[in-house]
Structure formats: structure tokens, C-alpha cells
Amino acid sequence: MHTPVLLNEMLDILNPQDGKVYVDATFGAGGYTRAILKSANCQVYAIDQDECTNVFYEKLVNDFPGKVHFCVSKFSKIKQILHGAQLKKVDGIVFDIGVSSMQLEDASRGFSFSKDGPLDMRMSTSISNVDASVFVNTAFEEEIANVIYQYGGEKYSRKIAKAIAESRKKKPIKTTGELASIVRSVISRSKNHSIDPATRTFQAIRIWVNKELEELEQGIIDSADLLNPGGKIIVVSFHSLEDRIVKVMFKSLCSGSSVISPIGFQLINKKVIRPSFEEILNNPRSRSAKLRAILKI
């Protein structure tokens, strides 16, 4: 079974208690939810926009009957979901942001530049209509360049966008392998650098397709209103754009003058929490993870 990143650190901060209600806003394979349910006699409401995660929910239902509840949805709808379940307040909300290992490893989902598959990148095929193929084949060259630069921090964004525009004139770009080849034709891999040249471009397009940063902002805004006093919001993020949003929004909530919530918060960890050396050795994907948490006063 896959162990989610910073699991022990998340549990130490959340400190699940009997009789409390928690939300796993990014259910995935259910690692956080399972750990919370094993820690206390509590309830967990799990949310994930990926329909494929339902199979993991079914396993948890058998292990924890009546304790776990699941909804296929974007977590930006967290307020509507909980109110629909007759819940006004909860005691903790956890987020593990970004693409999951199982999504990356499934070539048919179109997230990976190392496995050829349809150029999709949607975390939900039923909720989202525009996939990565539509974007790269129909967006203006300037828009593609801006997305790759803004969301990927790619300094060769204009060269990549130009190469994409030239390639699609000949035939539509339909697979991850085709897109990765186009990017690699523009950027040569450095001998001293292990990161694939296509990494930043794929990250940027994925973020745009799924509106990930907008989702994160809305998720935090609504979560702040849903917590009981003593409740906690915990966010694990994997790149600087996400972490910057979390840091700024948490600072605003804790400043005492936030327009998001009139009730005060305080930082649980003033310094960002990172994975241990041992965890990085066991799971290299965790190397960029950062955990931030706040407490509702």
C-alpha cells in the first residue's frame, strides 16, 4: 500500500480525537483517511474529483463501516458538500495537493512525459471538459507561452510555445510522447541535471487544465469558515506556486484582519515542515513536499 507523504507529521498535528469529524479533501488512495480512522473513533468525510478513487473508498467502507463518507467532487465545493451532509462545522481538514503517484503511473491519464498516452491531464473526466490536447492544439501561441512560464517557471516558454505551434500545423498533438518530444527538441538535457526537460511544461499545462491554484484558494477560504474552535487546516504542497498561496493565505488568516474569516487563527508551525531524509530515500517524490498548518482559535 502506498504511504502518503508526511503522514506521521500530519497525524501529529491533526491529533485525531474520538467523536470528532474530519475532512480529507484530497482522498486519493485513502492513505490519510485510513490513518485518521485508525487513530481515533471518529468520522471522516473524504472528497476527490477523480472518479477512479472510488475503489479505495469501497475498501475503507468495509474496514470502517459507518465511519467514512465519500463524495466525487472538486474540493472547492467543500462547503456545499458538508452542508449537504447536514454538517455546519468540522474539527480538521487536510489537503495533499497536486497529482498523485497512481495518476502519474497510469499512462492512459496523460499526466506523464515518461509514459506515452493520450494527452489528457484531467483529474476528473466527468467534471472537466477541456483536456491538455485541446489546450495545446487550439490555444494561441502567446497563451501557451504565458501558461508554461507562469505555472512552470520555464525560461524557454516562448521557444516551446513556438515549437508547439509549428508542430500542430502539420498534425494535431495527441499524445504525451509527442508533446514531450517537442519540448525536448527545444531544450537539451543538461549532463549534470537529472530533471527531464519536459517537466516544467507538463506541470504548467496540468495546473492550467485543472485550475489547481484557483481550486486551492477557494478550498482554503471555505475551510476557514467550516472549522470549530480548535480545528486545524493542514496543507501539504509540492511546488512553490502552491506553497506561496498557502503561506500568504495562512498569514492573512492569522493576522487578525483577514477578510476571509473574522475569527482568528494561529500558525501551528512557523517554519515549513519538510520530509525527513529517510522518507526522501524511501519516496523520492516527497523531496519537494512542504507542510503548513493553522489552528482556529
Curated annotation (Swiss-Prot):
The gene is rsmH. CDD domains: AdoMet_MTases. One of its GO terms (cellular component) is cytoplasm. GO terms for biological process: rRNA base methylation. It is an enzyme of class 2 (transferase). InterPro entries: RsmH (IPR002903), SAM-dep_MeTrfase_MraW_recog (IPR023397), SAM-dependent_MTases_sf (IPR029063). Keywords: Cytoplasm, Methyltransferase, rRNA processing, S-adenosyl-L-methionine, Transferase. The keyword Ribosomal protein does not apply. Its EC number is 2.1.1.199. S-adenosyl-L-methionine binds at residues 30-32, 48, 75, 96, 103. Gene3D superfamilies: Putative methyltransferase TM0872, insert domain (1.10.150.170), Vaccinia Virus protein VP39 (3.40.50.150). This is Ribosomal RNA small subunit methyltransferase H. It holds the Pfam family Methyltransf_5. GO terms for molecular function: rRNA (cytosine-N4-)-methyltransferase activity. NCBIfam families: 16S rRNA (cytosine(1402)-N(4))-methyltransferase RsmH. Coiled coil: none annotated. It catalyses: cytidine(1402) in 16S rRNA + S-adenosyl-L-methionine = N(4)-methylcytidine(1402) in 16S rRNA + S-adenosyl-L-homocysteine + H(+). Its main location: cytoplasm.
